[in-house]
């Protein structure tokens, strides 16, 4: 008896492949800029948005996606004078190599040893 579900296509498989999601994050202009703006120093969302001249919502969206992929981490929390807790982000990678050939993609990530 054949399987009940049809065999997924290559595109359907890649859609959920972690490599594919990392490649998408690294090649999206906003995410790429956000990620590599916090390689050498930790920053909060406002600092990143101001430095890159992008909206806060785009910055939050990029950081949320990068954090889900474990490409950034919350380095620490900064407490403001009025008691607000601010997340300080740092990139977990300092470099990435992407290789794509035929039906195969490969991502090599280099850790950020800060």
In which residue ranges do the predicted regions lie?
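Short, Lys/Arg-enriched N-terminal segment that forms or immediately precedes the first helix
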Residues: 4-24
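Hydrophobic residues on short alpha-helical segments
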Residues: 23, 32-38
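Short capping segments at the starts of secondary-structure elements
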Residues: 29-31, 40-47
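A short acidic, leucine-rich amphipathic alpha-helix
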Residues: 47-52, 66
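Glycine-centered, phosphate/nucleic-acid-interacting loop/turn motifs that mediate DNA/RNA or nucleotide
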Residues: 70
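Conserved segment of winged-helix/HTH DNA-binding domains
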Residues: 80-114
């Amino acid at each position: 008896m054949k399987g009940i579900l049809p065999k997924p296509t290559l595109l359907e498989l890649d859609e959920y492949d972690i490599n594919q999601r990392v490649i998408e994050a690294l090649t999206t202009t906003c995410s790429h800029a956000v990620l590599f703006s916090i390689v050498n120093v930790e920053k909060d969302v406002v600092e990143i948005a101001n430095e890159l001249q992008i909206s806060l919502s785009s910055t939050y969206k990029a950081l949320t996606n990068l954090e889900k992929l474990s490409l950034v981490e919350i380095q620490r929390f900064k407490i403001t004078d009025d008691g607000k807790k601010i997340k300080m982000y740092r990139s977990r990678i300092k470099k990435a190599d992407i290789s794509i050939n035929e039906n195969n993609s490969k991502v090599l990530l280099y850790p950020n040893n800060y």
